[in-house]
Amino acid sequence: MIDLAPLVRRLAGTPLAEWANGLQAQLDTKMSKGHGDLQRWQSALDALPALQPEKVDLTDSFTLETECDGETRTVLRKALLGLSPWRKGPFNVFGVHIDTEWRSDWKWSRVSPHLDLKGKRVLDVGCGNGYYQWRMLGAGADSVIGVDPNWLFFCQFQAMQRYLPDLPAWHLPFALEDLPANLEGFDTVFSMGVLYHRKSPIDHLLALKDCLVKGGELVMETLVIPGDVHQVLVPEDRYAQMRNVWFLPSVPALELWMRRAGFTDVRCVDVSHTTVEEQRSTEWMRFQSLGDYLDPNDHSKTVEGLPAPMRAVIVGRKP
């Protein structure tokens, strides 16, 4: 059982205290329904060797270090491979380098210089395996709660939390819709790589705003296209082989959406083309990746002939 008592204590006396008090029951109900692969992933977690990090770096990377012999490292590597595929990372765990599909550290290096997370209560929506949560703590956040309904990501987070049990990061296997309306308790809310999967992007922005305290900041990272305020791409069917992609706005259009949703001080802090160096297949993620989704003769287009992935980071404030 995952014990959320430390989270309840952490949020006592905050606007999130009432919500926190009901989380254990909500989590237990969700876990009782389970997932077909959950037992296999739990076996991988149970196989993790008991190690105590002597050095932890979450500021410049995710790196745990301690004295570890080759045999123990082999056991560790096998257990972590049992939680494949690993999408977000990389993680350096006692000499085992988890070379994930995404170089998420590159994205974090583009996002983090524009933020001040010191002392902030943070919510990461669609947090994946929690890689960014750990980096947010490294940037000084007071506490970080991630929500993502994917059970494998939940287990990957648990693997890292085994070695960092006292740090104020929690992963809840919930969707944003599972959170109560008008939480209004987080200083900073992240939504990275989620908006284009939403059929109603404005509703998503409004739901994120509901999670923020007054004066709180939204960090929105999503796929965009070139163009003016009137340009929005709605794929006919798939985009980069993904079926569940709905709206890819231009940066000016996304800024307008955020203003219409009630955010102020809206500004774009980064626009980057995704490269096959940043997203690729590895030993830890053996399935197809970005290189398979681009036109082999023209990497400026997807296999469907649409503009290749370009991602923007927009920040805005709740008045």
Swiss-Prot record:
Molecular function as annotated in GO: methyltransferase activity; transferase activity, transferring alkyl or aryl (other than methyl) groups
GO biological process: tRNA wobble uridine modification
E.C. number(s) listed in UniProt: 2.5.1.-
Record's signal peptide: none
Reaction(s) catalysed by this chain's protein: carboxy-S-adenosyl-L-methionine + 5-hydroxyuridine(34) in tRNA = 5-carboxymethoxyuridine(34) in tRNA + S-adenosyl-L-homocysteine + H(+)
Annotated keywords: Transferase, tRNA processing
Gene3D superfamilies: Vaccinia Virus protein VP39 (3.40.50.150)
InterPro entries (UniProt xref): CmoB, Mo5U34_MeTrfas-like, SAM-dependent_MTases_sf
Sequence positions that bind carboxy-S-adenosyl-L-methionine: 88, 102, 107, 126, 176-177, 192, 196, 311
Oligomer status and interactors: Homotetramer.
Family under the similarity heading: Belongs to the class I-like SAM-binding methyltransferase superfamily. CmoB family.
Function recorded in the entry: Catalyzes carboxymethyl transfer from carboxy-S-adenosyl-L-methionine (Cx-SAM) to 5-hydroxyuridine (ho5U) to form 5-carboxymethoxyuridine (cmo5U) at position 34 in tRNAs.
Name of the protein: tRNA U34 carboxymethyltransferase
Native source organism of the sequence: Pseudomonas syringae pv. tomato (strain ATCC BAA-871 / DC3000)
